[in-house]
């Protein structure tokens, strides 16, 4: 029965099945899993009354998101058939007043809140033994009984860097948004690079949805100025030789062939990396990939990788990203999607499915004979609507991810299935130990055009060139001098955004840039 903002389920009869245990300790060490993840669904009977508070925004800018999660919470409560269960909803958009109201309702567990700041406030005000299942992905906002159901950014980054190791990537760079989240993700990439021995050799940041900023970041990352200058100088040398030197027919043919080859490209020079990891949204990634190709770095030059930020993005048919891989959650349960659409009139996003699982976990805890900590922190985890997951004593979550690959023809294929249990550890890094990363310039000896053209030995000594290189920090063995070093200048303040949230991204019509003229 629905009364205002409260669901009340009263027992009509039935035997006592189990009573919720005590809080337990949130700091306990989590042992290795010994069994498969448990299913969370069933019918719960108990003669004791149980109370659950739900803290979600129902008004304000995030009201639509909160209402979407609420629909899944209500679904889970109704489907559970739990007896003597009282569920109260509180509008977290009201701030600390709503949090105090939720705490004063004397709940056994709180589902929510959505944002990190609210989670911190709840953590500060709640009793130490009260468990909270939030939806923030900020590791600094959880702990001390506040847990999260969200996908932690480190899970996604570590999964894809591990795939890079499997692909035998030698060195990689990251392209990330110049936001708090972007710098944190870059830090996660650095930690994963160290853990899996895949060197991270460059990090470049851009303003989201800003074409000029994206262009500048990719131009810098591709060493475009140096590689273009080296290309120009190589053509000059070959043209001078063809015009001014007395050549044999074989020598002349060789020079002409090299000039013809150079005419088909705008740059020369090897890159100090063979992979690119995109840490932004799918739409920004498409722009970045187009500029990379424009500046002479395509899929043949560097393998491309992404994170769960691509999940749901309109990116599958992008030819510039053909072959790119990314980490993603498994498809949401079709059964849940069908039921949710029938109830809410719209497809569920990932947060809605997280809310459904959070509610089932909460109900299971209240009706369990285990302590709260023992139930919630079960090392075997649970089977949810988006695959298996488990909660950690630190408050973080772990979710099994699969590896997807873009085929370039609108299709996405699974190249590595998600794990189905936690018998072996899935992750080695924790977000709370990650430090945000700043820009990392490429360490390169630059580009000497003489290394990319072949001259007759008898005249080679007459022609020389300086080495061109952007952000050149490694020592060069060449005897040529006048090395040009070009450093980026950027006095913009970082752009701070809301919490990272693994929600489905709305498709945006792409504008191709193939015809843009780039001024050097």
Each predicted region: which residue ranges?
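Extracytosolic ligand-binding ectodomains
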Residues: 2, 6-12, 19-520
